[in-house]
Amino acid sequence: KFHPNEAIEEAYRAGQRVFGESKVQEMTAKYESLPKDIEWHFIGHLQTNKIKYIVPYVALIHGIDSYKLLAEVNKQAAKAGKTVNCLLQLHIAREETKFGFSFDECREMLAAGEWRKLNHIRICGLMGMATNTDNDEQIKTEFCSLSSFFNEVKAKWFADAESFRELSMGMSHDYHEAIAAGSTLIRVGSKIFGERNY
């Protein structure tokens, strides 16, 4: 996130092909100027009015935090003639600043079943961010709760969906705990690129 193209090109030359960005404008500019075999993941809070800009090329949207957003991604994807891969974001941290469904809100949305009519999105898993704390036990507990919720959701609503397999959790400071709890996608930036410039 927010790292210059040169830093991404260096990682690209080392073999990295999946990159994440949290700002639509930033990601679109990078998509346009960097190699086209890069797989772009959108990992920030996505506003409905910005979806149309990333739908043509985004590989995975990590932060779907409402049915309204999911429906809008579907609408824009239909216009672009695409199916967009999405992760549902769960609020697992003890911080108000983080976005996401509560476990109950997510259960309600999935049980309601409206999402099944959205033919241009594919729900591929869940995403969550742990509390930004030095308390390793708390981080482990939060990741384990999301991992166990993932298993519940998979069994209830996606048992036959091979594509429902991603659990995006863990960043530079807590990815060890995330992997131990079952993460399949870690979002590591500063450990690779150094601290970013805001």
Language-model segments: residues:
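Short C-terminal tail/terminal secondary-structure segment
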Residues: V188, F193-Y198
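Divalent-metal-activated hydrolytic enzyme cores
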Residues: T184-L185
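Conserved alpha/beta-domain cores
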Residues: F2-H173, I179-A181, F193-E195
